[in-house]
Amino acid sequence: MIAKVLSGGLLGIDAYLVEVEVDISLGLPIFSTVGLPDGAVKESKDRVKSAVKNTGYDFPSQRITVNLAPADIKKEGAAFDLPIALGILTASDTILSTSIKDYLIVGELSLDGRVKSIHGGLSLAVAARNSHLKGIIVPKDNALETSVVKGIDVLAVEHLSQVVDFLNGIHEITPIKVDIESIFNTQSAYPVDFSEVKGQEHAKRSIEVAAAGGHNLIMVGPPGAGKTMLAKRIPTILPRMSFEEALETTKIHSVMGLLEPTKALVTHKPFRSPHHTISDAGLIGGGTIPKPGEVSLSHNGVLFLDELPEFKKNALEVMRQPLEDGKVTISRAVSSLTYPARFMLVAAMNPCPCGFYSDPHQECTCTLPQIQRYKAKISGPLLDRIDIHVEIPPVRFRDLSTERTGETSKQIKERVEKARTIQQERFKGKKIYCNAQMVSRHIRKYCQIDESSQRLLERAMEKLGLSARAYTRILKVSRTIADLEEEDHIQPHHISEAIQYRSLDRTLL
């Protein structure tokens, strides 16, 4: 007898339907799986056999053939354990109901029949809804993330016997429901705040501008100046995530198995801070079946690269495409996958190997060739893609000793959100969301400047030797500064401030 159970596989951050066909026939008791299974899928036969027996059901002593269709796509992971077990029990008449065809079923089985969590539950739920299925049966640990998808029943299970009893009509399983609005309200607090940062008003202003326009930022300063402290507080002033952004971000984290069972959605802007020893594949993504890297895990959030010159030069150079396009494409012989990678890059570095080149109180011990080699690790093309450069001086004693606190993250965030609202109105229907994403045609339309601003910008270009890409970055940042001041037109003082944020072109190149 042949039984068919619907399951799903992952391709990038999206899912596709997999039809699990189980045939039980006369012959030697051999269990074979076809349809391009990987090692984990091939090993499922031992997990399934033990789970079925230890749950109290009879396991057929006949030839069992499992086919995973479509057969031309490689299947990976242990999520097929549960549908294979249910297919065997259906083919052997232990499950008599025909309602199994209405559900997409996924789950890894332990040897005692418990159903364990899988990766990509949210993407699989979206695939079930798009295929007009009645519902999806998932492990309990994946219930919250899958329940944010409306239009299908999400049935959370803990044991193989629970699924069998449900399909045979012995017990009911109540679909899981979540309140999306309450999720956003209860998961929106941050443990850090900008009011904790002493001094550094110029740096705070540059970070506010960067957050308001979604601009990339690099901070240069001696050790202990507060670069890391400032960077970790950037997510606290970024605009609240929309449901669409949260859904897309959660998909990526779910596929990588990074979503906590107690969270339905990633509602905080991601903040990723990889170590400088990270490989190209770890940063951009890769593998035989390509997986997302850090640039995709920081999608809709912040990617913080501390000690930027210590990263491998090749790892930094491969970031050019995602910085420019907001996505990363990984090509392999068997497939080519594109992952979203629209993030705010925040980098930090010392001015020299010892860190005290610009410190007025500490003597720099580096030679000029050492400093030049250190700075040369950051290429001009990469630096051109970073809109805002800011020098972070050492914190003054009077700033450290004062009891007065600076602005809170909430106060700064209000101004940032006002500026973003202006940008959303400006770019309505254009598939871009902030000033940093503008391309040439948008810059020509929305970044027009008067004659005095033009002369000011021309002098700066000649004096600093700025590139054509740096010219467009200045215009984008000027537009953001004008938005923060709720000005319709870019004024000369907006241009002047934006030029200040390119001054490191002269010292780094």
Enumerate the language-model features and the residues they cover.
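Peripheral, non-AAA+ core regions of ATP-driven protein-machinery
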Residues: 1-218, 222-228, 331, 470-471, ...
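Basic, amphipathic alpha-helical bundle interface domains used for macromolecular binding and assembly
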Residues: 40-45, 60, 67-77, 289-290, ...
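Short loop/turn elements that form and flank the Walker-type P-loop nucleotide-binding site
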Residues: 59-62, 99-100, 132, 150, ...
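Catalytic P-loop NTPase motifs of RecA-like helicase/translocase cores
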Residues: 112, 305-312, 355
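Walker A/P-loop
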Residues: 219-260
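Conserved inter-motif catalytic segment of the P-loop NTP-binding fold
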Residues: 245-279, 286-287, 393, 433-442, ...
